[in-house]
């Protein structure tokens, strides 16, 4: 997905938390890939639409000291959020540990509501929990 609403997704697109303390640069040469929601316990609560990038596809431009790590259950996935404003920015995925999921709502000038319907992953019945 290379355009969301009127916003062209840049090959290197900036993402920020709400307060601006955390700034990321995402490598998105193919636009937003795999936009989705998840119905696991944490994703239901944060409600974000998420895209994916390779582990080397996120660069922290500023605010690394504001990023806090949250883990639960198997402690495999690593969820990061801004300790100042509380916004979830990205996570290292449990189902694909070679990828980060990122909060599409953090992309500069992108309104995730312009994406429309997206697939919802079954995080309640995650294969790693069987």
Q: Which ranges hold each PLM region?
A:
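A short Gly-Trp-Pro
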Residues: 1-16, 21-130
